[in-house]
Amino acid sequence: MNNPDDVLLINRFLRQQHVLTLCAGSGMDMWCASCFYVFDENQMALFLMTEKHTRHSELMLINPQVAGTVATQSRTIALIKGIQYRGEISLLSGDAEQAARNRYCRRFPVAKVSSAPLWQLNLLEIKMTNNALGFGKKLHWSRVEPL
């Protein structure tokens, strides 16, 4: 069972940030990328835009299981906050793609000139470090319902 207080803090953090590190892999081939994202807390999902011909996208099309981080850049140890996540990503199409694109372009207006596809990263597991709550404080969330 997810702790409601942890969920509130995790959601607030994901709403406040906008860049994630995404790690994809298949077999011995792995690659990471930094991407802008929009958080959908109702679905516990992140929407991101990236071309299909990139190395990380080609890997995601083979293996949709991904992992990554969302972190602040604090120079003060007591203020460090960050998330490690595991999820499943899929390329959007049709109405779902258009809805995600509209939402993404509202957050990042410069994206209106891009035709790059939108992806939905369904979060499966999150561990958040929040030193503002005490050094090394960890918050956890995991998806309880199947996708």
UniProtKB/Swiss-Prot annotation:
InterPro entries, sorted: Split_barrel_FMN-bd (IPR012349), UPF0306 (IPR011194)
Record NCBIfam families: PRK03467.1
Family stated for the protein in its record: Belongs to the UPF0306 family.
Name of the molecule in the record: UPF0306 protein YPO3467/y0717/YP_0616
Gene source species: Yersinia pestis
